[in-house]
Regions:
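Phosphate-group recognition and catalysis centered on beta-loop-alpha active-site segments
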Residues: 1-209
Length: 209
């Protein structure tokens, strides 16, 4: 759907199953698949037997990157630090074989230690810390791993935060925007991107501003 709507990018969440980064948001299987229990209990065989829709298991990151083939940006949110090495492997494969440029593949995480790990394995690759509060030092948390952007919560993003991030050379990308009033407010604040569930809805509002 995102490709059909010509979205600028796709956001997805990955967790580690065996030697694959699997695209799944929740820690548990029951909400988004026909499985039960924790994702961490899966092995390769049990993952392949899951039904996440149309009889298919949740895709791996490598499978999705091969399908997207550089047509848009992909934001990879790390849901567990243990997946870092596998995500680095998949990023290298996507750049080498699937038509992506490095700047199209940003890695984000609430666990900033995971971004430090990734920065050590893949120096200079785009990373963005996720934050859910407006910190006293604003966007300073992005500096230890040379981030290119910071991903902030819609309810806590204000002008002081945006100005501080921009002064540090960071893009500000805000998640997850579902209300027109918030979209307009963020546009006026000068944020660089927003995460939305409905691309056509957001474009319709922004085109009128």
């Amino acid at each position: 759907m995102a490709l059909a709507e010509q979205a600028d990018g796709i956001e997805l969440d990955v967790r580690l199953v065996a030697d694959q980064a699997i695209i799944i948001h929740d820690e548990d299987l029951d909400r988004t698949t026909n499985g039960l229990g924790a994702v961490t209990n899966l092995d390769q065989a049990s993952w392949q037997q899951l039904d996440a829709g149309d009889g298919n298991p949740p895709p791996s990151l490598d499978q999705l990157l091969a399908m997207v083939a550089g047509q848009c940006r992909v934001n990879i949110e790390l849901k567990c630090r243990e997946a870092v090495a596998v995500v680095v492997r998949d990023i290298k494969q996507a750049i080498a074989a699937y038509g992506f440029r490095a700047e199209q593949l940003c890695v984000s995480a609430f666990d900033h230690h995971a971004l430090v790990d990734l920065h050590k394995l893949l120096p200079g690759h785009p990373v963005a810390p996720l934050i859910s509060a407006c910190h006293l030092d604003y966007a300073a948390c992005a500096e230890p791993f040379a981030a290119q952007a910071i991903h902030s919560h819609v309810e806590t993003t204000n002008q002081a935060f945006v100005d501080d991030a921009h002064a540090r050379g960071l893009d500000v990308r805000v998640y997850t925007v579902t209300r027109e009033a918030d979209l307009i407010r963020l546009y006026k604040l000068g944020v660089d991107a927003v995460f939305v569930n409905d691309v056509a809805w957001a474009r319709g509002i922004l085109s009128a501003l």
